């Protein structure tokens, strides 16, 4: 009888712990997103990073981190986070768009062309951005 009560107690405790842990994962992302929307990028970066610790496949946290690093003009970390988003979800249009812009900026034109082709094949929401990307690439190529 005592063993049964002990087992039930342990299972109940584990259940509550896992539920609390799942809620904290969502809280980190939600807090980070609110801070980002309020332009508190340094604070939001901390919570996005914390969300990634508990949820390493959080493509949205990586995407927001890339946007933060873009604002900080840290091209390497922006690129790393965008590449991580695309590893997690190769059809993430916003990541493809931002990575294309970054590659045009870095004069990596072959990669930019490849990403525009990818964007063309996967686009659903951001198809209107493809001509803009092509124009940026073409104008940069003409000026070189």
Regions found by a protein language model. Give the residues of each.
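Canonical tetratricopeptide repeat
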Residues: 64, 98, 132-136
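Canonical positions in the second alpha-helix
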Residues: 51, 84-85, 118-119
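Structural signature of tandem alpha-helical TPR/SEL1-like repeats
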Residues: 37-46, 71-84, 106-115
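Alpha-helical segment of the N-proximal tetratricopeptide repeat
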Residues: 24-50, 54
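Register position in tetratricopeptide repeats
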Residues: 37-38, 71-72, 105, 122, ...
């Amino acid at each position: 009888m005592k063993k049964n009560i002990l087992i039930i107690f342990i299972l109940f405790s584990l259940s509550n712990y896992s539920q609390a842990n799942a809620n904290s994962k969502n809280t980190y992302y939600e807090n980070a997103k609110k801070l980002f929307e309020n332009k508190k990028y340094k604070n939001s970066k901390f919570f996005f990073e914390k969300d990634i610790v508990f949820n390493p496949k959080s493509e949205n946290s990586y995407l927001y981190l890339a946007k933060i690093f873009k604002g900080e003009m840290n091209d390497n970390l922006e690129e790393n986070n965008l590449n991580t988003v695309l590893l997690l979800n190769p059809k993430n249009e916003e990541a493809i768009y931002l990575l294309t812009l970054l590659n045009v900026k870095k004069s990596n034109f072959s990669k930019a062309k490849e990403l525009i082709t990818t964007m063309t094949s996967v686009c659903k929401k951001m198809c209107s951005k493809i001509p803009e990307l092509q124009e940026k690439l073409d104008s940069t190529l003409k000026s070189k």
